[in-house]
Swiss-Prot record:
Keywords, alphabetical: DNA damage, DNA repair, DNA-binding, Glycosidase, Hydrolase, Lyase, Metal-binding, Multifunctional enzyme, Zinc, Zinc-finger
Active-site residue numbers: P2, E3, K58, R284
Any one GO biological process: base-excision repair
Function, as annotated: Involved in base excision repair of DNA damaged by oxidation or by mutagenic agents. Acts as a DNA glycosylase that recognizes and removes damaged bases. Has a preference for oxidized purines, such as 7,8-dihydro-8-oxoguanine (8-oxoG). Has AP (apurinic/apyrimidinic) lyase activity and introduces nicks in the DNA strand. Cleaves the DNA backbone by beta-delta elimination to generate a single-strand break at the site of the removed base with both 3'- and 5'-phosphates.
SUPFAM superfamilies recorded: Glucocorticoid receptor-like (DNA-binding domain), N-terminal domain of MutM-like DNA repair proteins, S13-like H2TH domain
Name of the protein in question: Formamidopyrimidine-DNA glycosylase
Organism lineage: Bacteria, Pseudomonadati, Pseudomonadota, Alphaproteobacteria, Hyphomicrobiales
Manganese keyword on record: no
Subunit structure: Monomer.
Parts forming coiled coils: none
Binding positions for DNA per the UniProt entry: H105, R124, K167
Length: 294
C-alpha cells in the first residue's frame, strides 16, 4: 500500500493535468471497486472544475467548483495514468503492475478540457473513490479519526508524547496507528526509528516523561520522521512492489534505505558494528539494528 510520500508524489504529478481544469467527461467502466461508486458519481463530476488537488494522509482530495470534494485512495495497486493532449502516457507515482493491453483495469477515466486523459487503473480493485460535500468532509468516516499530518505544524514532540502517554503498545505500532499520526506506513516508520536510534520494540509511553512533557526520545523522533518523509518525497518515493511516479519513472528512495529490506547487511551508523535484523511485528516485517537502536 502506498505511504504518504508515494501519495504526495502522485498528487504533484497530477496537478498539471487536473488543477484548474474542467472535467469534460467521466467514464466509469466498472463501479465495483473496494466500495461501489455512488449512483450519481459521473453526473456530479462532469463539467466541474478541479479548483485544487490536496492530500490528507494517504488520501487524494480534489476540490471541485461545485463545493464537492472527490476523495480518492489508491488501495494496494491503484495508479493514475495520464496522457496529455494525445501524447504518450505517463504514470505519476511509483507503480509496478503492468497495464493490460486491453485496458481492462482502467476503471474510471477522466477526460479533461486541456486534452488530458487520466485513467484510474487498479488490477486488485482495493482502491476507491467517493464524492463528499466540502462541508461534510471533516465528518467523513475515512478522515475524521486521522491524526495530524507528520509534515504539518501541528505535529511536534509535545503532541506525539501526549498521544503516546500511557500506551503499552510498541513504539512502531503506535506510529502505524493513523489516529496517532496520519500517513505513516511500515517502510518509513522503520527508517525513522533507525534515524532516531530508537528500538521498534520500545514502549510508546516512553515518549512522554513522568510529567507528561516530551522525552528526549520524542524530541529525536519527530525531526527523524520529517527528514525521512521529505527525503522520500524529493526522491519520488519508493519503487517497491506497486508504486511508480506519474512520469512512469521509478522512485529512488529505496536506494537510500538504511535498514528497510537490508536484513543481514552491516549497519550504516558510523562506528556501529551491528547487523540489520528482521523480525515480524504485528504481522509486518520490521527491520532494525539492535546494536544502535535502543
Amino acid at each position: 500500500m502506498p505511504e504518504l510520500p508515494e501519495v504526495e508524489t502522485v498528487r504533484r504529478g497530477l496537478i498539471p493535468a487536473m488543477e484548474g481544469v474542467r472535467i469534460a467527461r467521466v467514464t466509469a467502466h466498472r463501479n465495483d471497486l473496494r466500495f461501489p461508486l455512488q449512483t450519481d458519481f459521473v453526473a456530479r463530476l462532469g463539467g466541474r472544475v478541479v479548483t485544487g488537488l490536496g492530500r490528507r494522509a494517504k488520501y487524494l482530495l480534489a476540490d471541485l467548483d461545485s463545493g464537492d470534494v472527490l476523495l480518492m485512495h489508491l488501495g494496494m495497486s491503484g495508479s493514475f495514468r495520464v496522457a496529455m493532449d494525445g501524447g504518450q502516457e505517463a504514470t505519476p507515482g511509483i507503480f509496478h503492475h503492468p497495464r493490460s493491453e486491453s485496458r481492462t483495469h482502467d476503471h474510471v477515466v477522466f477526460e479533461m478540457d486541456n486534452g488530458a486523459v487520466i485513467s484510474f487503473n487498479d488490477p486488485r480493485r482495493f482502491g476507491y473513490m467517493k464524492i463528499v460535500a466540502r462541508a461534510d468532509l471533516e465528518a467523513e468516516p475515512f478522515l475524521k479519526a486521522l491524526g495530524p499530518e507528520p509534515l504539518g505544524n501541528e505535529f511536534n514532540a509535545a503532541m506525539l508524547a501526549q498521544a503516546c502517554a500511557g500506551k503499552a503498545t510498541s513504539l512502531k505500532a503506535a506510529l502505524l496507528d493513523q489516529r496517532v499520526v496520519a500517513g505513516l506506513g511500515n517502510i518509513y516508520v522503520c527508517e525513522a526509528l533507525y534515524r532516531a536510534h530508537l528500538s521498534p520494540k520500545r514502549r510508546a509511553s516512553t515518549l512522554a516523561s513522568r510529567t507528561g512533557a516530551p522525552s528526549g526520545h520524542a524530541e529525536r523522533l519527530v525531526p527523524a520522521i520529517r527528514t525521512v518523509l521529505n527525503a522520500a518525497i524529493e526522491a519520488g518515493g519508493s519503487s517497491l512492489r506497486d508504486h511508480r511516479q506519474t512520469t512512469g519513472e521509478l522512485g529512488y528512495f529505496q536506494h537510500s534505505f538504511q535498514v528497510y529490506d537490508r536484513e543481514g547487511e552491516p549497519c550504516r551508523t558510523r562506528g556501529c558494528k551491528g547487523t540489520v535484523k528482521r523480525f515480524t511485528q504485528n504481522g509486518r516485517s520490521t527491520f532494525w539494528c539492535p546494536s544502535c537502536q535502543k
